[in-house]
């Protein structure tokens, strides 16, 4: 069995699970009447399917696992206790349902789906109250907590992509000018410590990486800096439009004057690399980013940040029970992303060691970048 742990006590887990559902429900309440399916998109899920998938995942891991499963039997294919929803595994198992098919699967109505979600969450909280001293239960409850909050962030990305009016507006930092940070050649521990509580399998475990001397921006590239690059021939982000002598950007359902000192977001890795190249610099590797993040002058932009690395396993990688979280994406086509989370990332995932990943052409995440260079 992999090293699985959660340091959250049962009552804290129950409160956090309830808070995550409240975040999801606040977005669900704001969907337009015809928005529960929406048009097909290769990077989005239909909301009705996605809500049900979140519930299915929680029920699968926290309520339906049978004791005595063989050690080499996959938890995603092993016999399970029955779901409270008919045909749940056929409808909502993302490991088995191709992305495009999620718009075609017959799904329960939104009211029935949300009622199932309430029933499952109440059962999970009751199980925590009875057996919260079980470390495996606490681990899987925390796994489901992070999974739900990740899907909440995916819904915010959908809100931006579709131009919907959100239930709240972002509070993004105004990034002041700052001198780049310089580091000499040294070794950095990349990854998470074994005694730090819940981590995902792709963060395991801390291991030394040698770095040559480098320089890295103290904070992400701003809209103003990117606009100057565009004025010299660079490609503007897709959600910008010319407005007089300047630019506007689309934030959800409205166009606003370009916030000059906010981090530039919704750029692909190719756009980030082109900006860095024009400046005579490059994107940082993940180890440089992680080392620099401990510096007192290192500023986060409340956005994800592209790195130069491909998403790849650490030495000795072993998949955790939810094997499809990382393993399928070690395919050479996904880029490693850092940033300690965006403005809609749950605070429990906002840690420098957290590894996110996207294919390099993606612009829909709340993602920006900073630049670096070798010394």
Where are these regions (language model features)?
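Active-site microenvironments of metalloenzymes and redox enzymes
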Residues: 64-105, 109-132, 215-292, 375
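Short acidic N-proximal helix/loop "leader" segments that mark the beginning
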Residues: 185-206, 233, 243-251
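Bulky hydrophobic/aromatic "packing anchor" residues in well-ordered structure
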Residues: 188-190, 216, 264, 337-338, ...
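Surface-exposed recognition segments
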Residues: 204-207, 233-236, 299-375
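Cytochrome P450 C-terminal beta-domain/meander region
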Residues: 292-300
């Amino acid at each position: 069995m992999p090293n699985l742990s959660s340091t959250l006590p049962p009552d804290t887990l129950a409160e956090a699970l309830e808070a995550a559902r409240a975040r999801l429900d606040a977005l669900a309440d704001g969907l337009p009447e015809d928005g529960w399916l929406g048009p097909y998109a290769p990077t989005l899920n239909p909301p009705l399917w996605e809500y049900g998938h979140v519930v299915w995942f929680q029920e699968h891991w926290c309520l339906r696992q049978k004791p005595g499963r063989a050690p080499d039997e996959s938890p995603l294919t092993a016999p399970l206790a029955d779901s409270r929803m008919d045909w749940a595994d056929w409808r909502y198992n993302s490991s088995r349902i191709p992305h495009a098919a999620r718009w075609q699967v017959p799904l329960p109505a939104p009211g029935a789906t949300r009622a199932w979600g309430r029933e499952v969450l109440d059962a999970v909280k009751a199980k925590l109250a009875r057996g919260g001293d079980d470390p495996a239960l606490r681990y899987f409850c925390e796994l489901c907590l992070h999974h739900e909050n990740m899907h909440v962030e995916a819904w915010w990305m959908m809100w931006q992509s579709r131009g919907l009016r959100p239930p709240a507006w972002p509070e993004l930092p105004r990034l002041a000018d700052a001198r780049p940070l310089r580091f000499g050649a040294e070794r950095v521990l990349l990854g998470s410590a074994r005694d730090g509580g819940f981590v995902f399998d792709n963060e395991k475990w801390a291991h030394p990486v040698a770095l040559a001397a480098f320089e890295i921006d103290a904070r992400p590239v701003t809209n103003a800096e990117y606009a100057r690059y565009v004025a010299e021939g660079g490609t503007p982000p897709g959600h910008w439009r010319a407005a007089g002598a300047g630019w506007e950007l689309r934030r959800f359902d409205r166009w606003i004057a370009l916030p000059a000192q906010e981090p530039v977001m919704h750029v692909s890795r190719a756009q980030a690399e082109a900006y860095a190249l024009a400046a005579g610099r490059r994107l940082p590797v993940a180890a440089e980013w992680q080392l620099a993040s401990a510096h007192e002058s290192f500023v986060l932009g409340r956005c994800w940040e592209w790195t130069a690395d491909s998403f790849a396993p650490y030495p000795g990688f072993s998949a955790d029970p939810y094997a499809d979280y990382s393993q399928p994406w070690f395919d050479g086509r996904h880029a490693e992303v850092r940033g300690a989370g965006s403005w809609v990332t749950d605070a429990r995932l906002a840690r420098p060691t957290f590894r996110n990943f996207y294919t390099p052409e993606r612009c829909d995440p709340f993602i920006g970048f900073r630049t670096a260079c070798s010394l």
